[in-house]
UniProtKB/Swiss-Prot annotation:
Pfam families: MutS_I (PF01624), MutS_II (PF05188), MutS_III (PF05192), MutS_IV (PF05190), MutS_V (PF00488)
Keywords in alphabetical order: ATP-binding, DNA damage, DNA repair, DNA-binding, Nucleotide-binding
Annotated protein name in UniProt: DNA mismatch repair protein MutS
Superkingdom per UniProt: Bacteria
Amino acid sequence: MTQYTPMIQQYLKVKADYQDAFLFFRLGDFYEMFFEDAVKAAHELEITLTSRDGGSSERIPMCGVPYHAAKNYIEQLVEKGYKVAVCEQVEDPKTAKGVVRREVVQLITPGTMMEGRTIDEKENNFLAALTHFEDGSYALACNDLTTGQNTVTLLTGSVEDILLEVYATGSKEIVVDSSFSKDELNKLTETLKMTISYEDATAIPEGLEHLVKNVSQAKLIKAVGRLFNYVIRTQKRSLDHLQPVEIYYTNQFMKIDVHSKRNLELTETLRTKEKTGSLLWLLDKTKTAMGGRMLKQWMERPLIQKERIEERLEMVETFVNDYFLREDLKEKLKEVYDLERLAGKVAFGNVNARDLLQLRRSLLQVPAILEAISLLDNAYAARLIQGADPCESLTELLGRSIQENPPLSIKDGDIIKDGYNDKLDQYRYVSKNGKTWIAELEKRERDITGIKSLKIGYNRIFGYYIEVTKANLGALPEGRYERKQTLANAERFITDELKEKETLILEAEEKIVQLEYDLFTALREEVKVFIPKLQHLAKVISELDVLQSFATVSEEEQFVKPVLTTKREIFIKDGRHPVVEKVLNGKLYVPNDCIMPENMDVFLITGPNMSGKSTYMRQLALVTVMSQIGCFVPATEAVLPVFDQIFTRIGAADDLISGQSTFMVEMLEAKNAIANASERSLILFDEIGRGTSTYDGMALAQAIIEHIHDQIGAKTLFSTHYHELTVLEDSLDQLKNVHVSAIEENGKVVFLHKIQDGAADKSYGIHVAQLAELPDSLITRAKEVLAQLEGQEEIIIPKRVEVKAQAQEVIPEPVVVKEEPVEIEETKAETEEESQLSFFGGEQSSKKQDKPVLDAKETAVLTQIKKIDLLDMTPLEAMNELYRLQKKLKKG
């Protein structure tokens, strides 16, 4: 390294500690990058790659960005999952001896970003830390640096289960120890697309012990310690806004695994991965950013304590019934900014004057909000606002200190109000009156000299000056002015009087800017004292915001308050899928009941594709989730139990972790439900067994249904195309057949989207293909093949005619295949030969046989065959019927 210049040596020394990050190295007005950083950054940021002499024989790759535009470039890199170490000059270059001293002042990572376009105002930006213990358990700690929120939980289960819980936090970055399994790290980076960081220190850092007072378990403390040590090491600044660690256990909330959350589209849609079209999109009528974040957290973790759910429902009911209270609250909430993130900026030291004005405007709304809620006759409301401090002294302080329209930068002055500081007022008086004096001097000099174009100006190099054009130089009184600068068409002069005033004015202006900066930083420290109170207020206001949001959407969409029962019964009258109904935007939506008394556990749902089976199943799950987060539900009446878990297998399998096949994922999800569901769970299985052969699939589906029915007793909706399974209603007393109705009109299927008792009488597969606009020729051929499979009495099958190039088109002549009288074949081989030929559309055997005389049993079978409506049966149903008739004949 000795061959490099001192500056490059300094760069390499700093870079050695930040090998996994881009090093933004401050050089004057630029942040420069060198060596591999420069090559990679130039590519990622699409900026010019240059080179410079660094003392070695070869030039060093280099690229840079202006310091005033660095924020945008840093955000671009962090968005892509990179880390950026910001290295600043920490001494004045004018007074430095040798190379200017530089230090990394912050490491910016995906999990520690404080602001920017990557930070959604209504979403948390969690940094996760995962700690593995010898007994196979894990502790997961999370921190949102923008709000100061900290959580920790203990996890058990497979590695995939643990990683899915990590995925559920939405974290973009995870901190682990340096010995963490490489295989597990690969799953985090390749599948979950998370940035990996390392931290081996696990002791709680000095000064943060108060944040873990309520945490006694050593494993949890170790995970939190790893998280806090990483945050301190990377941020290198005050963390006064960090909140006490909240412990949560997964069994305290309704458990919904990641696959189920995605299938149900709770917070984002399956197709676009966006909020629009999800349940969160529908329910989010929050007026504050922090309310939006709390709503999402509630949706991620629905409650299972009946009393807590009912408390929320009662508050929502209060807001629904009191329009004026709700509207007044909404108007005030509109004026409340993000108190949590403002508190974080105060602690971090990057809050500006405009931020503090937002804080003041927010606090002005608080007294009226708290007073309105205090008047409610509601124990939950009283408990919610208990201890909430409106911080009126802070409001008053900000009101008399900050100008109404301050600049964005805190170093440009014009931030502090007149009257806040005596010394500042004095400097401003000198500056203001000095400029007035300058204007008066200009007028006086014009009168004395008679030169109307004479003017007094200012620039940073020469200060104040009197400027006279060369044409008027002869009119100047002798000895009155001292020449200062000669221009092409003018001369500039000064006087002793002007010099004196210049000194006073410039000193005052410099002191104003510096004093305002000092006063603002002191004010910022005063605001820090209020951070805990502001965070408590933020939680109160967030909760009120979510509750009014529930009330608003419940009234707008005509939702009803659910009644929670300790019984295992579901009674939903005219239930609707809330999102589908909203998307239909006024078009007719068909509501459906879901009535499952205590002695009814399984609905076996049949019906054609596109008829609404999956929508009906999702509808029940969404109604359940809405109920247990404390929202009204889309129905005219709803009585619901409190479910402990929801398991789903709906839609296309999407394996997040292990890369398994669709059928394997389907079976793993079925296993998850069977292994973990209780009689208090809700299971939704859509077309289980479709990923394998017909008989395997049907056998598995039946076995799963029987196990759920006999061993678990969970409320279950099980949709299937295996119509043969509907006979289970005869042997399973807590299973009921229901179907989605459809009718045929003019050869076309019309879906009624109505759930009715009993099994479906037809699958309408080819009709659905018609709706999908498959080619007419394909549809016609499908009907022909179906007719062959079902043994139709008379089938018209077009001959396949090969048409050679440029040959005349030949229209195939239809061949009529007539059904021979039913006869019992003497040998199995002959029977199979006939069957195979018929299946592939070949000609019947030419072997002539005498027409036998049928006995009474055979005649009865023939009569039954003629009465069968084959177009109303699935291929499997037709085959089963054929076996039954064959057995009947053989018995004879």
